Amino acid sequence: MNIPSDNIPGRMGLNLTESTPAIKQWAYPWNAPGQAIESPLPTYEELHRRDRENAALACAQDLLQKQSVIVRMSVNAKVNKLEKEQGVKRANAYLAKTFLERILPRVNIVSERYHIGKMTADTVRLMYRFNHLPDMSKEDIELLAQDISTFITMELSSINDEMPEAGELKVLHSLYVRAARITQAFRQSAPDFEKLMRRYFDEPQAAAALSRMMSDQWWARRLRRHAAEWREHLHIALNHVCKKVSTYASKQMIRDWKEQKRRTREFLKSMELEDEDGNRISLIDKYWGSVANPAIRRTEMMVRIRGFENVCNELGYVGEFYTITAPSKYHATTIHGHRNRKWDGSSPADTQNYLRTVWGRIRAKLHRNDLRVFGIRVAEPHHDGTPHWHMLLFMRPEEVEQVRGILRDYMGFWFGIG
């Protein structure tokens, strides 16, 4: 029996073709797939992750509060900027991860070079103030210098009572040793220490050195310099000295330098020179007309180099221009302005000492090979303040390849020939 297709059960009223999409039907509405029910409570994994993040954030905040004002202001400024632009979560991540893993180790390396780690009972208050030198004003540094000089004077006064029958030389030696130990405890080198203690103890020289260590003005100069180096080194560690922020030196150092130059100009303007006949001339005019003027000093240097080159060419020498720089570990910042992970905490002064040491070895090698070179050398900073040297050396034409080979051997690929 032939049954029309329209009368087949399940096909009534349907004209199925290959192009008709399949329609899913469910016996009951609750059989249809729905959205999964999510628990309103966090999972154990989320709770543990949140606890770890909160603990890391609290640890970072606690460590940040122990840092100097320079570090706190820099990190807080970055955190506030991230919170404003990308939200609280991104700002907390920067504080808990970037600060702890990248910034804080660099800051600790720098601080260990300048602060006093082990304190004694009699100088604990002075040393505590000393460890806050980067945050101290000029007046606070001068007050600390007075207190240290007073402490040294009081310490030395007890030596005379302890050695009533000793000779003058022995007493002077004991006074110098005690003062030198206190000076070294405050991260300063005692005057003429190597010469007096390891070569010959000269009484007049020791008395002069002892007088300096008891002077508050001497201590003020030393502490101001120590504080300035400490602050600038912290700025370098915080990546404040680079092409993206401030080239060659930090903004604070540049402001201080300009202020010092301004005070010097004001002092020179207020002074006059007078000869025996009563003729007077402004001291500032003589200053700007001498080599103290940077423009005149630079012009004189260029003229001297050109004249030096002309004389050497007439004598048959040839000139070679060399540029030597330090390895990557001496650079706090990469060429693109990012933090250098290979940096070992070296300061620009450390880099300069490294270049001097290597150049001393090169000179010794040249001397052993009977190669006589002479010329002019200048130091120039990279964008992160790390110095490199430019040297214009003159030598005999037949000695050029030997000199180049020696520089290659000692400098490796850390040098260039122009």
Residues covered by each model-derived region:
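Positively charged, glycine-rich low-complexity segments
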Residues: M1-T386, F394-G418
